Structures are given as structure tokens and as C-alpha cells.
Design a protein with these regions (language model features):
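Small-residue (G/A/S/T)-rich helix-start motifs and N-terminal tracts that mark the onset
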Residues: 1-79, 89, 174, 185-339, ...
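N-terminal small/polar loop signature for handling phosphorylated ligands or for N-terminal nucleophile
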Residues: 65-143, 278-290, 299-300, 304
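Short beta-alpha junction loops
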Residues: 83-86, 154-156, 343-344
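Short gly/ser/thr-rich secondary-structure transition/capping motifs
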Residues: 100-106, 132, 156-160, 221-226, ...
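Internal gly/pro-rich beta-alpha loop/helix module
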Residues: 116-117, 122-213
Length: 505
């Protein structure tokens, strides 16, 4: 698990290292430059000619130091000061003086076509306004050059918190970011502008008490999944109830239930309309199918299950509305874990009085369109503030919010947040969300290997990460263009095996 920081959090960490620990800012700048040179050298070939483009802030100071280090290695390098020299920070002015002493070549009118590598050190995480005018022209020239492109800490023009483009942004092949990955390097388009991202240790003081605004999971976090109990039975590995599948929509029920079983749930029951019974029993004989919706049957299903999933293929008819309301109310009464997805969310948006049944036992899994219906905000507003939207939804409902997008945000009412970096565009296909709801249900049934009972938000984040990992494995063999939702399920065994390898099993 890796911490992800906002611009303010990174500034505070810098300040703590410099003022409280006593590490001079010049030392941090030198270490940053060394890391950029170290990573850039991996891409260099013979007869390289490097241009480092520098602003007047500390990002520019990093860049001048990079130019000096390349110069001392005998590599052809020049630096170009696009920032106002009269407004250089103290550290950058010192780097400029040192570079002058070492006679590092400086250019005032670079011929962009002559360079094989361009290093962007114009703006860092401190950028607060759109880039325009002279600076925009320079970044346009940098992007147009046929050269390898390296960004120092963050591509100029990328918002360090949201990943949004601030007027124009540098398009890098490699970004060497310092100490922690910035949140803006997780969200698109910032993640796209960054290219390959390397997080470099430059000596920023790290203490356990440092609270970051978000975190992201890695393959090694799958070791939190428990070993399969050798004397367990199908009942002890989790029982999931799916309230789903209107007529003609048994595919959603099948995908969701199948994913739950493949992800490790011991038993599955699907409550659906009678017309779906035979198709489901043929497609998934391991599942039990119930087509009764009366009080007695509902009570039996509620008593039987450990987790409820409402929504995939449910429809929005009067009968579907009544089924959802019954199970929402009952789950709230018994605090039974419940996942609300697809039409379950659409019905919730149409009946805001049901919000009273939500709480910490609920996981909401909206995509951007469903969140727009739930929140009343436009899709563009949500895309521009996706993290804040997820946090607000979680706070207002008391539930875990899994806001699905290219970078899915998982948040709870306490402000704990995960950004998911697994997955790919091949997963943007019909049924992928149904598969996710099934995987989440299976994970909610598990007792993770943690010292304390883990919060629901961590289980949800693990489920989302596992879903994305399956998609990455599928894309590697099938290609993103050809992927189907069922391919994600197909690769669950391989993805779970990676978790077992991380656990040393």
C-alpha cells in the first residue's frame, strides 16, 4: 500500500524535513536532481543532446541541477531559463550561480529539433493558475519536439491534486516524482501526461504518523486475503444473496453471481423472476435460484445470507422497487452488509427517502452517470471533482462509496480514501460492473489478515483492485479491444494466485 499526497501535504512534508529535521533544502534539491539523472540515464543512447527547460521556482532549480550533473558526466546538455531570473527562489538562484561556475551551457533561443531528450522543469506542484502566453508557447514547442520527454516531479500544467490540465500540459514519456506519488498523477488526464511514473526517495522525512489524503493498493496487498481454512465448508466461506435479474436481464445476474463464486464465496442464491430460472440454472448450476418474492421467502433469504447484492439487471419496475425497499429496510435493521449497484442505485436516486436505510453496512458502486443521478450534479462537475464527490457521497450516506471511473475512488464517511490504479480501458464493456459487484460481495465475506477488524472501505478497495488486476491479466493475453466482462471472471484464479504468492503460500 502506498500513500498518495496532495500538493499541500507534500509541501508540509517538505517543510517538516527542512525546518524540524534540519535537512537543508539544497540537499533535497541535489538528491532530487540525482534521481532524475539516474532514471533518465536508463533511456539515453550515444550522441545524446539534452535540453533542460527551467522555470524560476524550485522545480526549475531541480532542473538546473540536473543540467549541471549531466554536464559533469560529459553528456551534451544545455539549459533554458524560461522563468523570470529576477523572481527565482533562493534555492534556484543558488543553483543558477553554481551552474554558471561550472560553465553549464545556457541557451536563450533553443532549436528544438536538435535535441534528443527534453527535460521539463518549468512548473511543479505549486502551479495554481492556467498556463498561457509565453509559457504555453514554450510547452507547445516542447511537446512538438521529436525527443524523449522527461518530467521533473510532475508534468508542467498538470494539477497535482485533480490531474486536470491547466491550460496546456507537458506530455512526458517518464515522470520522476519525489517522495510520494501525487494524487494528480493517478487521475486522468494527468496520469496520461505523466507517462511511466517512478517515485524516487530523496530523503523526505517519513513518519508513521504522516496522514495522507489517499492511498493506492499493490499486488502485495492481496496477501491480506485469508488462507482457505482446511476444515472449512461451503457455509463458512460466505453466502451471498443476489436480488437481481428482471425478465430478459439474467446475464447481469449470471455475471455477478459467477464472479462471487470464482472470487471465493462458498454459496450463492439468486432471487430473480421465474423467466430467468432455467437460463441461470443452465449457465450457473452452482448457484441456487429463487423466484418467490413473498414475505416468508424474503425472511428466509435474509436469515441465510452473509452479504446482499441489490441491482444487477434488477430493472426499475414497481415489483423491483418493492423488492429493493424490503431488503434495504431489513438489511438496515440487522446491519447486514449490502452492495447497491446498477438499477439498485437508479431506484435509490428516484426514492431519496430510502437514504435513511443506508449506513456503514452499505457499499454504493455508482459510475459517473449513476452518481450524477444520485447527487444532482452534472457529469462534468463530477469528473472535475471526482475525489471530493466520492468523499461527500460517503459522508452524506454514512456508506462506503465506490465511484467507478478510469481511476476508481473508494471512500468512507471518515474520510479514508483509496485510488485504484489497476485495470484498463478493455474493462469498459457491458457487464464489467456486474462482475465487480460479485467480487466485492465475496471479499466482504472474508476475514482479512489484519490485526484489527478492517474497515469496510479497505475490503471494498481490495475488491476493486482485484477486479482491475483480473482485467490487466486478461488484456495481456486477449488484448483490450477484444475483452468481455466474462474474461475478467476467467482470470480471477490467476489473480488470486498472485495474492497467494505474495503471502508465500
Amino acid at each position: 500500500m502506498k500513500k498518495l499526497v496532495t500538493c499541500k501535504e507534500m509541501k508540509d512534508l517538505d517543510s517538516t524535513t527542512i525546518r524540524e529535521i534540519g535537512v537543508p533544502s539544497e540537499v533535497l534539491m541535489e538528491r532530487a536532481a540525482l534521481k532524475v539523472v539516474e532514471e533518465t540515464e536508463k533511456y539515453l543512447q550515444k550522441d545524446e543532446r539534452i535540453l533542460v527547460v527551467c522555470g524560476s521556482g524550485n522545480n526549475g532549480g531541480d532542473g538546473i541541477a540536473v543540467a549541471r550533473l549531466f554536464h559533469l558526466k560529459g553528456i551534451r546538455v544545455e539549459f533554458y531559463m524560461v522563468g523570470n531570473k529576477d523572481k527565482m527562489t533562493r534555492e534556484t538562484a543558488l543553483q543558477y550561480k553554481i551552474a554558471s561556475g561550472y560553465r553549464v551551457p545556457e541557451v536563450n533561443n533553443p532549436q528544438w529539433s536538435e535535441y534528443t531528450t527534453i527535460v521539463d522543469a518549468v512548473f511543479g506542484v505549486g502551479l495554481t493558475r492556467p498556463i498561457e502566453g509565453h509559457y504555453a508557447d514554450i510547452i507547445h514547442e516542447m511537446n512538438s519536439a521529436r525527443a524523449k520527454k522527461i518530467a521533473v516531479d510532475i508534468p508542467s500544467g498538470v494539477n497535482g491534486d485533480t490531474g486536470l490540465e491547466m491550460g496546456i500540459a507537458f506530455s512526458a514519456d517518464l515522470t520522476v516524482t519525489f517522495a510520494y506519488r501525487k494524487r494528480g498523477l493517478c487521475f486522468y488526464p494527468g496520469r496520461l501526461y505523466a507517462g511511466r511514473i517512478v517515485t524516487a526517495d530523496i530523503g523526505i522525512y517519513e513518519q508513521e504518523a504522516v496522514t495522507a489524503s489517499a492511498a493506492c493498493l499493490e499486488n502485495k496487498d492481496l496477501q491480506l486475503f485469508p488462507e482457505r481454512d482446511p476444515d472449512g465448508n461451503k457455509g463458512t466461506f460466505g453466502k451471498v444473496l443476489f436480488v437481481t435479474g428482471s425478465e430478459g436481464m439474467c446475464g447481469a445476474a449470471y455475471l455477478s453471481a459467477s464472479a462471487a463464486l470464482r472470487a471465493g464465496a462458498g454459496m450463492v442464491k439468486i432471487q430473480t423472476v421465474e423467466a430467468n430460472r432455467i437460463p441461470l440454472q443452465i449457465l450457473l448450476p452452482e448457484a441456487m435460484v429463487c423466484s418467490r418474492f413473498d414475505q416468508e421467502s424474503n425472511e428466509q433469504l435474509l436469515s441465510w445470507c452473509d452479504v446482499i447484492v441489490i441491482g444487477p439487471g434488477l430493472g426499475t419496475s414497481v415489483a423491483s422497487r418493492e423488492r429493493e425497499q424490503w431488503f434495504l429496510t431489513a438489511a438496515a435493521r440487522e446491519k447486514k452488509p449490502l452492495i447497491l449497484d446498477a438499477d439498485g442505485l437508479n431506484l435509490l436516486a428516484a426514492h431519496p427517502q430510502w437514504y435513511q436505510y443506508l449506513g456503514e453496512h452499505v457499499v454504493l458502486t455508482p459510475h459517473i452517470g449513476e452518481m450524477s443521478r444520485l447527487s444532482g450534479r452534472t457529469i462534468q462537475e463530477i469528473q472535475h471533482e471526482i475525489a471530493d464527490t466520492a468523499l461527500k457521497c460517503a459522508a452524506e450516506t454514512g456508506s462506503v462509496c465506490v465511484l467507478k471511473d478510469a481511476c476508481t475512488v473508494i471512500a468512507d464517511e471518515k474520510g479514508q480514501m483509496y485510488l485504484n490504479l489497476s485495470g484498463n480501458s478493455g474493462m469498459a464493456t457491458a457487464g464489467s460492473g456486474d462482475v465487480l459487484s460479485g467480487i466485492l460481495a465475496a471479499v466482504l465475506c472474508m476475514y482479512l489478515k489484519t490485526e484489527e477488524q478492517p474497515p469496510m472501505v479497505l475490503k471494498a478497495a481490495l475488491g476493486v483492485y482485484l477486479h482491475g488486476l483480473c482485467g490487466d491479466l486478461a488484456a495481456a493475453e486477449k488484448g483490450m479491444r477484444s475483452m468481455l466482462a466474462g474474461d475478467i471472471i476467467e482470470y480471477l484464479p490467476k489473480a488470486l494466485a498472485i495474492g497467494e504468492e505474495e503471502s508465500g503460500l
